[in-house]
Amino acid sequence: MINKTRHNARRYALQALYQWFFCETKPDALISQFMEEHDLSDTEVAYFKEVVTGTIQHVAIIDELMTAHLDRKISALNPVELSVLRLSIYELLHRKEVPYKVVIDEALELVKEFGAEAGHKYVNAILDVLSSEIRKGV
């Protein structure tokens, strides 16, 4: 069963990170703008803020972890899939209370909704390997 408010937080976080991909706005400004433009009443707002800020703050480490498992340069990734991967890797690293299967399932739902037709297969393959590496022993 999906936690709807947490799912919405991830959904909006993906949209914010996608926007950040193109304009690299500072996290606080991006979050403020996003909250002004969207109704987040059905969303876990604190989680939204944390994952957006945290993903942006740790993007270099996240990208480094991801790059080892890509079959192409990071710049060649679809921006939606890249944003989903970054968000999910942040959760795997910093939200250990969230089961890795939930992180992957949520990522796949987001890619199916916003990404390319077969993008979920690519994202699943990368997150499957990374979740084992990041969460080993957890």
UniProtKB/Swiss-Prot annotation:
GO terms for cellular component: cytosol. The keyword RNA-binding applies. Signal peptide: none annotated. Gene3D superfamilies: NusB-like. The keyword ATP-binding does not apply. One of its GO terms (biological process) is transcription antitermination. One of its GO terms (molecular function) is RNA binding. Keywords: RNA-binding, Transcription, Transcription antitermination, Transcription regulation. Involved in transcription antitermination. Required for transcription of ribosomal RNA (rRNA) genes. Binds specifically to the boxA antiterminator sequence of the ribosomal RNA (rrn) operons. Belongs to the NusB family. This is Transcription antitermination protein NusB.
